[in-house]
A protein has these predicted regions:
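Beta/alpha (TIM)-barrel catalytic core signal, keyed to glycine-rich beta->alpha loops juxtaposed to Asp/Glu
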Residues: 2-180
């Protein structure tokens, strides 16, 4: 389910039950949901037996971890698939944060890119190294060009001592749906 709002309706319940029947008949192996924040998981987890959750995770947005849902899902045998590793490119492209919408966080991004430069660390290496702290089942990565792909394939793990603990709760920054 890409738009989970339907799961809060009678129609959604009916659709889910039909999907469970098809799953039992081996038409597919897993039923998954895609979320933007963890607030919906209490209701959905109580009312539906899904197999996978696709959610955002990056150095700024660790809500799946900080809310305890990562551990809960793991303990229930539910797969965690993470996306938005580079926050729609914002964490790896210096030009993006200069857009007017991100003015409020300009200092954060200047410090981010400057600290990486000072330590001779690529943003892609840093973001991917941060993922290594968890046992995510799948990682969905977007790229803009072949150089990005090469860097991802050849990424070098960043020393944990050089990792900064960001935890941003401002959804106007970490939820791309709010970007204008």
């Amino acid at each position: 389910f890409h738009d989970i709002k339907i799961l809060f309706t009678k129609k959604g319940t009916k659709i889910f039950k039909n999907l469970e029947v098809l799953k039992e008949k081996k038409f597919f192996k897993k039923i998954g949901i895609s979320i933007y924040d963890t607030n919906c998981l209490n209701y959905i987890n109580l009312n539906y037996n899904f197999d996978a959750v696709q959610c955002p995770y990056n150095i700024l947005d660790k809500r799946i971890i900080t809310t305890g849902w990562y551990d809960k899902l793991k303990n229930q045998g539910i797969e965690t698939h993470v996306r938005s590793i580079f926050l729609q490119g914002l964490l790896v492209n210096k030009l993006l944060y200069k857009k007017n919408y991100f003015k409020k966080w300009k200092k954060l991004f200047i410090n981010w890119f400057q600290s990486l430069e000072n330590d001779n660390i690529s943003p892609i290496d840093y973001c991917l190294s941060d993922l290594m702290n968890y046992d995510f089942d799948k990682i969905i990565i977007g790229i803009n060009n072949s150089e990005n792909l090469k860097e991802i394939i050849n990424f070098k793990t960043v020393n944990k001592n050089k990792m900064i603990n960001f935890n941003i709760s401002d959804t106007k920054l970490i939820d791309p749906r709010s970007w204008k």
